[in-house]
Design a protein with these regions (language model features):
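Sec-dependent bacterial lipoprotein signal peptides
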Residues: 1-21
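Long, charged/polar, soluble alpha-helical segments
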Residues: 2-4, 21-212
Length: 212
């Protein structure tokens, strides 16, 4: 966060300098802005976790351009900005497939938990959508479309978690209903239902066991 503020302050200073020197001076404002945007792009795919060395170098190079401009070393400043951009792009490309893979693993775990909660029966629509999104993530990853894989995995994880929560809520309601039926069956047994209505009692017991 501090480095981002320093970089922003540096760019503001450089823009002011560019205006004061006039339009003809080759101060690399555009190159520096592109480098800053590429660093932000790398940060968006967790390059701080997956490519910390590359991201750190990109930030360092960009910050260094400020001193170069103050020293009137404009060509070196431009090259520093270009190098910063390249290093940030490297950080992005290194991080994205790793982020996609890890997000797919999280989604797979969420799908497993949804399955354990019987979401395939109690929240079928969301569960099937989660499965479809996870398949899309896998297909995209195999095709090296890592950003699409990452986005699909995020969607699969969200849907799987929602399906699990819906299923758990319905299971609680179902459990209460089963308990009520058990109570009714127990009362019927006391009233000799096994003697008077054995088939009906058997059907009720089997249905309740199936719902359990």
């Amino acid at each position: 966060m501090k480095s981002a503020r320093k970089t922003a302050a540096s760019i503001v200073t450089i823009v002011v300098a560019a205006l004061s020197f006039g339009c003809g001076d080759p101060i690399p404002v555009r190159e520096m802005s592109l480098a800053r945007m590429e660093i932000t792009r790398a940060e968006s795919v967790r390059a701080d976790k997956y490519a910390p060395a590359e991201l750190g170098e990109a930030r360092k190079l960009l910050l260094g351009t400020h001193e170069l401009i103050k020293g009137d070393e404009l060509e070196k400043a431009k090259q520093g900005a270009l190098d910063s951009f390249a290093k940030a792009r490297e950080a992005y490309e290194k991080s994205l497939p790793l982020l996609a893979r890890d997000t797919m693993e999280i989604a797979e775990k969420s799908l497993g938990e949804a399955d354990e909660a019987n979401a395939d029966m109690l929240a079928r629509d969301e569960f099937e959508k989660a499965q479809a999104a996870f398949k899309t993530a896998g297909d995209s990853f195999e095709s090296k479309k890592y950003y699409e894989a990452y986005q699909a995995a995020l969607e699969a994880d969200k849907l799987a978690k929602s399906a699990r929560n819906s299923a758990l809520g319905k299971r609680a309601v179902l459990k209460e209903a089963i308990a009520e039926v058990d109570s009714v069956i127990a009362e019927a047994v006391k009233l000799n239902a096994r003697t008077h209505s054995p088939e009906k009692l058997k059907t009720a017991e089997e249905s309740n066991r199936a719902a359990s």
